[in-house]
Amino acid sequence: MTKTIKTVSFAAAAILVVIICTFLIIRQTHENVLSKETVVKKVEASYEGKVTKATQSKDKKTYDITLENPKGTYFVKADAISADILSMNRVKAVNPSAMTEKEAEHLALERVPGTVKKQTRQSQVATYTIQKEDGKTYEVKVDMQAKTVLSADQISSKDQQKTPITKKEAKTIAERKTGGTADDADLEESEGTLIFEVDVDLPDNKEATVKINAYTGKVANIVYED
């Protein structure tokens, strides 16, 4: 009986020691945990961004942080004691703003110095026809979103005939054919051919739409409206 009591007492004492040690370890760990503000400051300084959200995990061992900087939005997991970064994943990339047409033209002229003879644009790709001082002509394509030159190819004399006329030239042709004043001109593709549709205001308060082949400059159709 006495032996049994001693065994139980010893087991109880051992369990108590384990509980006390565990409590002390947890307490010490919690005392060493850095504050949210401290961890946030370190993360912002390290990655030159702004922390928009920071929460501590249930076990108090890590901080889950949302960071935004010029490169995008990141989900960061930081150690609560050392503030070391345990993991970092970009969840959203920043979509850079596209360059202006003036900036795109400047980039094209950097690649091929000369005089811009014609310029067209489809979506985010601007195309420039540039003539150099030696008389050679090049077609330069610029990706305005990526801010890079896609291609810069010399145009042969035969290919130059395929270069579209400008919007200004299309308006002049429409005015000459109708005797009115061109209001607007849109470049569209029809059955594989580029067509300028030019809206013209006529002297008798009427309007007309003139369709012009963008390659040849010939009038394909004129529609008069009341």
UniProtKB/Swiss-Prot annotation:
Localization, UniProt: Cell membrane
Matches recorded under Pfam families: PepSY (PF03413)
Cellular component GO terms, alphabetical: plasma membrane
InterPro entries named in the record: PepSY
Record's protein name: Uncharacterized membrane protein YkoI
Gene name for this UniProt entry: ykoI
Membrane topology: Single-pass membrane protein
Keywords recorded for this protein, A-Z: Cell membrane, Membrane, Transmembrane, Transmembrane helix
Chain segments annotated as transmembrane: 5-25
